[in-house]
Regions:
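Carbohydrate-associated surface elements
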Residues: 41, 163, 182-183
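Acidic anion/phosphate-binding donor-loop and adjacent secondary structure
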Residues: 169, 183-199, 213, 349
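Conserved donor-binding/catalytic core segment of Leloir-type glycosyltransferases
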Residues: 158, 195-221, 234
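N-terminal subdomain of nucleotide-sugar transferases
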Residues: 1-55, 224, 385
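Acidic donor-binding loop of glycosyltransferase active sites
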Residues: 155, 273-290, 305
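Nucleotide-activated donor-binding/catalytic signature segment of Leloir-type glycosyltransferases, i.e.
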Residues: 243-270
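Membrane-proximal helix-turn-helix segments that form the acceptor-binding/catalytic region
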Residues: 83-87, 105, 109-113, 122, ...
């Protein structure tokens, strides 16, 4: 059986999607499938390390200033060539698609022409996320129709969690869906006995865009420094909000305590997380985030690092109901509340034995490999039907 994965983002480009799709591809390979990945050429200077036994085909794509495939001109620079790459390649038994909606729509057209089923990794409802960056009714209306049309043609949606599936149903998208949850790649993220730092260090790892609202921790850090003068806040990742956050740090006079870094490979990030006082994660208080989950918490927990989350959505329930006393805390999207939680973590950092126990618990509960097995089980059932 031949499986083709269509995704604008894949290793060595650093993102949650890259790691997730790699585990899916490897699981398809282990089940005896012939796996091909159609993706984009990576950013300049990236070192390619493709998974064994999987063919990865890359094509040029338009990237933004941060070398990221973001925005609809960039998406179309991937989607239009993708249509021809799919049309004129050897026929597949299944397409696996990573959004944006335009990519899913392209795959629906080709899938119909080639009579090939497709499934979608549905981690977000893009139409609502777009409300953060445009108020144009025309653009939002077109996007909703394109997204609904693409998702409605799939044989299966692998949704991030049940609240997102429920949101699809409200929007009239009735495609069969399996909430698969989230996890971390436990081969990369682990705890190796690091002691908590002194002075305290807080890590934000991942994208910081408008709907993440990660600048809340810059404001909180201004208060934290009153109690812990040597504390640091470090951002690893990229996003549209970076310049605004840097300006905010300068305006508060704390620019030397707030540092920004490019994305780094998971294994390197794991070492940093394992040695941090806590990780911080946030989602802005907007309607679409009522069902969005801050997936970066899973990597943190796998590395034995507790989480401080600020914002709405399922992450709050996850942390408050986690079956582990050291998983972390959830607070409102408020700088004062975030600062209080950060000060508490700095005053009583989690010791190594408790960090080791947290990492062990997390790796047993939230493994990307286990999720990949479920995805492939469902996908192969579709092929065989």
């Amino acid at each position: 059986m031949r499986v083709v994965i269509a995704t604008r983002i894949f290793g060595p480009e650093i993102s949650a999607a890259s790691g997730i799709l790699r585990t899916w591809a490897e699981e398809f390979r282990e089940r005896g499938c012939d796996v091909t990945i159609l993706t984009a050429k990576p950013p300049r200077g990236a070192v390619i390390d493709d998974p064994r036994g999987i063919e990865v085909r890359r094509a040029p794509v338009k990237r933004d200033r941060q070398q990221y495939v973001r925005g609809y001109l960039s998406y179309l620079s991937f989607d239009i060539p993708l249509a021809f790459r799919l049309l004129f390649s050897r026929r597949a038994d299944l397409y696996v698609v990573e959004p944006p909606p335009t990519t899913v729509a392209v795959v629906r057209v080709v899938a119909a022409l080639r009579r090939t089923p497709y499934v979608v990794r549905a981690a977000d409802y893009w139409s609502e996320a777009a409300e953060m960056v445009t108020s144009s009714r025309l653009i939002l209306g077109v996007l909703r129709r394109v997204e609904a049309w693409g998702l409605s043609g799939a044989m299966m949606l692998f949704s991030a969690h049940q609240p997102l599936t429920d949101r699809f149903r409200i929007a009239g998208i009735m495609t069969p869906a399996v909430p698969i949850g989230f996890g971390a790649e436990t081969k990369d993220f682990r705890y190796d006995g690091q002691a908590p730092p002194e002075p305290p260090v807080f890590i934000y790892a991942g994208t910081h865009s408008e709907w993440h609202g990660a600048g809340i921790f810059v404001e909180a850090m201004h208060q934290v420094l009153h109690q812990h003068p040597g504390a640091r806040l470090e951002y690893y990742g990229n996003g549209e909000d970076r310049e605004e956050m840097q300006a905010k740090a300068r305006g508060l006079g704390i620019e030397k305590s707030v540092e920004f870094y490019a994305p780094i490979p998971p294994a390197a990030l794991s070492t940093i997380l394992a040695a941090a006082t806590a990780t911080v994660a946030s989602l802005a208080p907007v309607p679409r985030n009522n069902y969005a989950l801050a997936t970066k918490v899973y990597a943190s927990l796998a590395a034995g690092c507790p989480v401080i989350f600020a914002g709405p959505g399922p992450t709050v329930e996850f942390l408050r109901q986690a079956d582990h006393p050291y998983a972390g805390v959830a607070v409102g999207y408020d700088a004062d509340e975030a600062a209080t939680a950060m000060n508490a973590a700095a005053a009583a950092p989690l010791p190594p034995p408790d960090r080791a126990e947290l990492a062990k618990w997390s790796s047993g509960q939230f493994s990307l490999s286990a999720i990949a097995e479920r995805v492939v089980d469902e996908s192969l059932a579709i092929i065989r039907t």
